């Protein structure tokens, strides 16, 4: 074993107290074989290679049962029995029963690794020193003076503030602190849903129904999907009778319906959800993902109201999907035709984001600026940002890389760099970096090499020479997601821990998703459907405490437009931002976004290799597998 110790297996007696008559078993980074040869007990039920515990640098580990007898892992209140060749992630404090009910060992991370500092501070600092330094250092360090795991631990937002930010999806096997304020599909689809429209690329009905039993009670369900013929036939056989399946038209080759959203109609209003996960098990349990949602009330039908930007963008996008109109009798509300214009019946004046969508086609004239990166360019050009964001860097983070060239990268960065400083001067071009997992990140991930199947970019796209200057590491210690491979897609402009704007989207880095200008920039060609939400520094304090699912009666202020919105600037920041009171307006509202990765990101070293899913990897992963299997 390596001389570096990452932790120990500490023997326990039947009362789960430390058994001092037996020695602790040291663990090193990488595979540790545990069995009869190094466990100081005499029991023939223990194999010589009873289990392999593969420890990662962050202290988490994967346990693989190698012997013929089962092993039990107790994590919190959960007790899981594993048979031969089954595996599970374990964390600090978990208890392993080498034989069920016998030979207890606690997995303990060494103190030097338990609370790793984020590029600031040392392991042997006194807590009081760290607290003093926390208040003394500027906010644009990377969480300086604050432990990595404290960042997501402190992300607690009241219900009325949730639409101002987004949330990460819950990841199985992570310690509790890493899932603070995270959500599962059951947290989203709940209550008395009358109509559900589920928009996605991949849909596994066999997983979806047990994962979200509330769907079985919804009278009208429309699934807008991007599945192929084989899966579609299975979906038709397995779906409920009241479900409608629809695949939107794809007029240009190599396009997909890739948008991930939900529209849930309630007696009191509509819930709009935009997220990054396919409707499959691994996406909602094993990946780093993001989700935004907001509830909106029905409009007062007796009061004429004009649409807002959010409403117009939403209805324009829904109209492009061309789903078959259907009738729905909504109890207490009446009969309705469920088509895109039905969604004009809700009041979106409190929307906290702008929609950035893509639809396939050759877009010209007024439509040139309605979709893709030209829509983002247009919205940003209408915005004013703090002067500190002039020439500030850009981040492109996604999970699939298209076939790109330098000309198109310049076209995209021109859109991403749009906007003006508060003195009316342009922000200017920002230098982009691409956050992309390395081969080693995938190999050591929660899923091992299998996690790379959801990062489906071929070597010919990834290993283009001009991309080398863009590569940056996926590091997510402060959210506990270093080993939860990213399927989330985000684009942002930042300075330190402050964000000029932030886009959570289904769009990967590809011409198919964002569009490519043609014909002397007079036409934008897009192949795919995409949808994202753009967070901007707002000059209005939005009333967004309306809920479709709580039991209280919404106040009048929450049912319609805000008559006297308080003018107040909002500042967007990461979870590791520290308020030094030096660069922040006292009257401004600070909105924390759970950006899962570290900013600024660490550039690739000469040893780092970007992941390509069609290469062969012979170094075994955390489950002892090679790639492809």
Question: Over which residues does each language-model region extend?
Answer:
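PLD/PLD-like phosphodiesterase catalytic module centered on the HKD motif
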Residues: 2-50, 54-57, 74-92, 97-629
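Short aromatic-glycine-enriched beta-strand elements
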Residues: 59-62
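Flexible glycine-/small-residue-rich
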Residues: 65
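Short, solvent-exposed loop/linker segments at beta-strand-coil boundaries, enriched for Pro/Gly
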Residues: 69-72
């Amino acid at each position: 074993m390596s001389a570096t110790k990452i932790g120990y297996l500490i023997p326990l007696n039947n009362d789960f107290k430390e058994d001092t008559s037996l020695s602790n078993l040291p663990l090193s980074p990488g595979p540790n074989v545990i069995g009869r040869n190094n466990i100081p007990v005499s029991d023939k039920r223990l194999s010589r290679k009873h289990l392999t515990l593969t420890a990662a640098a962050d202290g988490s580990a994967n346990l693989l049962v190698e012997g013929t007898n089962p092993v039990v892992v107790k994590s919190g209140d959960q007790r899981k029995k594993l048979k031969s060749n089954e595996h599970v992630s374990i964390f600090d404090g978990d208890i392993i029963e080498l034989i069920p009910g016998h030979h207890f060992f606690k997995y303990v991370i060494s103190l030097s690794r338990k609370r790793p500092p984020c590029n600031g501070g040392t392991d042997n600092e006194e807590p009081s020193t760290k607290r003093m330094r926390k208040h003394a250092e500027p906010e644009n360090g990377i969480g300086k003076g604050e432990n990595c795991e404290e960042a997501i631990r402190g992300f607690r937002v009241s219900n009325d503030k949730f639409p101002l930010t987004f949330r990460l999806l819950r990841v199985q096997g992570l310690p509790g602190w890493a899932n603070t304020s995270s959500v599962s599909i059951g947290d989203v689809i709940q209550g008395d849903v009358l109509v559900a429209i589920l928009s996605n690329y991949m849909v596994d009905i066999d997983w979806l129904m047990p994962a979200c039993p509330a769907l079985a009670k919804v009278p009208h369900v429309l699934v807008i999907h991007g599945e192929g013929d084989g899966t579609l036939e299975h979906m038709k056989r397995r779906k409920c009778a009241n479900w409608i399946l629809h695949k939107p038209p794809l007029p240009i080759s190599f396009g997909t319906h890739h948008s991930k959203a939900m529209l849930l109609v309630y007696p009191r209003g509509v819930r709009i959800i935009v997220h990054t996960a396919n409707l499959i098990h691994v996406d909602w349990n094993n990946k780093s993902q993001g989700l935004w949602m907001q509830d909106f009330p029905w409009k007062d039908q007796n009061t004429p109201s004009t649409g807002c930007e959010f409403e117009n963008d939403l209805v324009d996008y829904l109209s492009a999907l061309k789903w078959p109109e259907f009738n729905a009798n909504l109890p207490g509300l009446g009969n309705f035709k469920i088509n895109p214009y039905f969604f004009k019946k809700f009041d979106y004046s409190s929307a906290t984001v702008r929609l950035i969508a893509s639809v396939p086609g050759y877009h010209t004239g007024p439509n040139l600026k309605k979709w893709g990166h030209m829509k983002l360019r247009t919205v940003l050009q209408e915005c004013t940002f703090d002067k500190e964001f002039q020439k500030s860097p850009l981040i492109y983070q996604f999970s699939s890389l298209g076939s790109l060239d330098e000309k198109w990268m310049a076209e995209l960065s021109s859109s991403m760099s749009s906007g003006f400083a508060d003195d009316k001067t342009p922000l200017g071009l920002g230098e982009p970096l691409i956050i992309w997992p390395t081969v080693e990140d995938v190999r050591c991930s929660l899923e091992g090499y299998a996690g790379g199947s959801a990062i489906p970019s071929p070597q010919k796209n990834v290993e283009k020479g001009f991309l080398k200057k863009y590569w940056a590491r996926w590091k997510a210690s402060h959210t506990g997601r270093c080993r939860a491979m990213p399927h989330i897609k985000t684009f942002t402009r930042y300075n330190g821990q402050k964000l000029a704007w932030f886009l959570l989207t289904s769009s990967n880095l590809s011409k198919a998703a964002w569009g490519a200008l043609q014909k002397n920039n007079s036409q934008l060609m897009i192949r795919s459907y995409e949808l994202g939400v753009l967070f901007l520094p707002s000059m209005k304090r939005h009333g967004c405490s309306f809920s479709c699912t709580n039991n209280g009666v919404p106040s009048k202020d929450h049912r319609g437009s805000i008559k006297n919105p308080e003018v107040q600037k909002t500042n967007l920041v990461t979870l590791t931002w520290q308020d030094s009171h030096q660069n922040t307006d006292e009257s401004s509202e600070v909105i924390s976004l759970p950006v899962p990765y570290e900013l600024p990101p660490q550039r690739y070293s000469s040893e780092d290799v970007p992941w390509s899913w069609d290469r062969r990897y012979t170094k075994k992963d955390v489950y002892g597998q090679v790639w492809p299997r």
